[in-house]
Amino acid sequence: MKHIVLFSLFLSLNFLGCQSPTTDKKTNDVPPIPSESWKANYDWVEPICENNVVKVRKNHKFGLADHNGKVLIPVEYEDIESGVSLNLNWLWAKKDGKYGYLDENGAVVIPFIYDGAKTFSGLMAAVKKGDKWGFINRDAEEELPFIYDEAEVFYQGKWLSPTLCLVKKGGKWGYINTEGTVIIPFAYDELDDFFTDDYCAAKKNGKWGYIDKNNKVIIPFIYDEVEDYDLKYIRVVKDGKEGIIDFNRKTVIPIDFYVINLLGDDAMRIFPTKETTIETCFLLDSLGNCIDGCEYIPEYYKTHKLFYP
């Protein structure tokens, strides 16, 4: 399912290392752009710079470097976490087939004894022993038992107090809090994230719908696919056709089209036939009114397109 997640994990907060250089106000000179020749020393360099840190690989081993090529974590691990700010968080790494955690200087802070590991969120992280997941603290002490089939990262959303985590048990997904109390029952084939949303897309008995923070059904489980945008509209798929509804279950665009793309500015691109070309589509606003026949779409979608047919 293509579900829009509208914000990033709170652990990845700082992207300053990837911004374009700014002008020095004292000299009016633009600082030189760092040379990227250092990348030739590696077999692979992560294409996206996050938090001034990139993942690198050489001879089948991974490490971390900054955007100038300075080695931050030695290239000696079978895998290593990327996209984290080293001054904010520990990161997992894999060595000799096992997972552990490193600090910002590359020192081992939790030994390599686990079969899987997830990002540390606050004081806890999900780790795997055998075929089950549990949660440990920063002293490597067990906080929650190893009883879960799968586990994600604890996070704090708009309403999520206490912090919740998406976990799987008995083949079904639900949410627990940091005490292990079940908040959303293990009743779903799939669950998306709440984050800052009031609602969560959920799949039950093979069909998609939406629930709220109290597990109340907001949108019934009758759709083959759902995709929301800004908590205003939901693109729904049913029996091979697509349409748009809102969170009050009101039909905005009838479920009678082959492809619908949710766009910015409350607009939608509609393909009434299976032929998804520029010549066969048109634009509608949120009220279902025709905006344009799409003659200008190629230029328009260079900046406005969010989804591709």
Go through each PLM region and give its residues.
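C-terminal motif of bacterial Sec signal peptides marking the signal peptidase cleavage site
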Residues: 15-17
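Sec-dependent N-terminal signal peptides
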Residues: 4-13
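Residue-level detector of conserved, function-critical positions
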Residues: 21-309
